[in-house]
Amino acid sequence: MTKVLITTVPFGGKDRLPLELLEEFNVDYLVNPLNKKLTEDELVEMVGDFDIIIAGTEPITKKVMDNAPNLKIISRVGIGLDSVDLIEAEKRNIIVSYTPDAPAPAVSELTVGLMLSLLRSVQLSNIEMHKGIWHRFFGKRLSEITIGIIGVGRIGAGVLQHLQGFGSPKILLNDTHSNYELSNRLNKKSNINWVDKDTIYQQSDVVTIHVPLTVQTKNMIKKKQLLIMKDDAVIINTSRGGIINEQDLYDVMQSGHLSGAAIDVF
């Protein structure tokens, strides 16, 4: 009987269909009993004789694989494989898959929601109201600002598409990979331009990050990049936590530079 370890959380909580499918095919499965993202050591203790891991973003390292002699498949739920040692998996003929399209619509919608929240001070107003403080904040309209999108893959392109419903904001794009189909489609739009990253940092009222975590993008945004942004700009990261240096972001915001940040990843 095939044994499956489900480490990603939550899994089957909102919809039991995935678990019912496993049961239908007589698959022996274990859902993460700790109900949280596992550390490397926790995964080492748990992985045992499982054949398949349905994984989240927990680190699946050589050490983990050493303790999983039967492991044949790592099925990553979500975008990005930076948490999996792909070289080690290839050496062991372990199949690695992922679901890049599944979370893209939700993350792109969340990103636009975070923009609106930051630009309208929704969260800050809510906090102050609960403290009995009545303070009127002046917001900004999306159609009247410049938005910089770094990374125009599935999620970045989704954000771009959603923004078309908010009038015609000026949009600056940057990506390490050429997207010729998207470029040709956007050539007719005068409010959208491809630029370098520094131009995005310097000219944008909102900077939103949608790149994978790699050696090249780790700590891509540090104090230097944050300080050339507008004083009242906001930054959003819904990609990977390691892309923005969090200590630098904290220090810069404590100094009064930047008016807000929305971080969905750590």
Residue ranges and their predicted role:
Residues 15-16, 37-43, 58-62, 135, ...:
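Structural motif corresponding to alpha-helix initiation and N-cap regions
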Residues 155:
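Hydrophobic/small residue at the entry helix of a nucleotide-binding pocket
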Residues 1-50, 172-174:
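N-terminal glycine-/charge-rich "phosphate-binding" loop or analogous flexible N-terminal tail
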Residues 92-94, 99-146, 150, 158-161, ...:
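Phosphate-binding beta-alpha-beta segment of Rossmann-like dinucleotide-binding domains, i.e.
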Residues 8, 57, 78, 209-211, ...:
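Glycine-rich, N-terminal phosphate-binding loop of Rossmann-like dinucleotide-binding domains
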Residues 62-65, 169, 178-266:
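Rossmann-like adenosine-cofactor binding region
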